[in-house]
């Protein structure tokens, strides 16, 4: 499948990794023109669905998770967004991240953990199962304004979320409330 040349910021090119789930290969293409997420049939290479995204260049890998019996996708960006894995239907978004997001979100404890640390530090813990625009809502369980990684992914291990900020600041917070 040829997606043609895309207008990436600083000519860095794609940095997202495709994710395979069942027969679907999920690919995120966030760039300076029309960004999108697409599901490709792994057997035929045919497009199953394609959903446009209101994003500029990001280099994040999508995270697939299951909630309430449904497979879903959460993708980091200037807004963290979730989509239905089977249809590509937009479910929710939460703004407030920095531009040029790279870390893949972590999911667990009924939360999506998204981090972005370029030009401003932000870590959000977003309650799953919501719909629509969650920015500045009670759907944000907690957030941090320091120690967010620019490149490394947050890692959820048991009840703890580990964050490695790019200048070697390592932190561990409780997943349920963000306290250190």
Language model features by range: what are they?
Residues 13-29, 58-80, 101-123, 148-169:
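Repeat-blade elements of multi-bladed beta-propeller folds
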Residues 41-44, 84-88, 127-132, 174-177:
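Short loop/turn segments that connect beta-strands within beta-propeller blades
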Residues 1-7, 46-52, 89-94, 130-145, ...:
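Aromatic (tryptophan-biased) beta-strands that constitute blades/sheets of beta-rich domains
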Residues 1-30, 40, 48-51:
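Asp-box/WD-like beta-propeller blade repeats and closely related beta-sheet repeat scaffolds
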């Amino acid at each position: 499948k040829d997606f043609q040349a895309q207008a990436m910021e600083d000519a860095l090119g794609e940095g997202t990794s495709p994710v395979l789930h069942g027969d679907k290969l999920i690919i995120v293409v966030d760039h300076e023109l029309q960004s999108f997420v697409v599901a490709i049939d792994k057997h035929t290479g045919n497009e199953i669905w394609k959903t446009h995204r209101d994003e500029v260049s990001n280099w994040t890998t999508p995270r697939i998770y299951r909630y309430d019996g449904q497979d879903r996708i959460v993708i980091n960006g200037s807004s963290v967004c979730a989509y239905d894995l089977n249809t590509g239907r937009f479910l929710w978004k939460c703004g407030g991240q920095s531009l040029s997001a790279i870390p893949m979100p972590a999911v667990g404890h009924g939360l999506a953990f998204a981090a972005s640390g370029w030009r401003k530090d932000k870590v959000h813990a977003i309650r799953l199962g919501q719909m629509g625009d969650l920015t500045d809502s009670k759907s944000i369980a907690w957030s941090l304004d320091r120690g967010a990684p620019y490149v490394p992914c947050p890692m959820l291990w048991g009840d703890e979320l580990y964050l490695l900020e790019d200048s070697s600041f390592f932190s561990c917070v409780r997943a349920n409330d963000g306290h250190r």
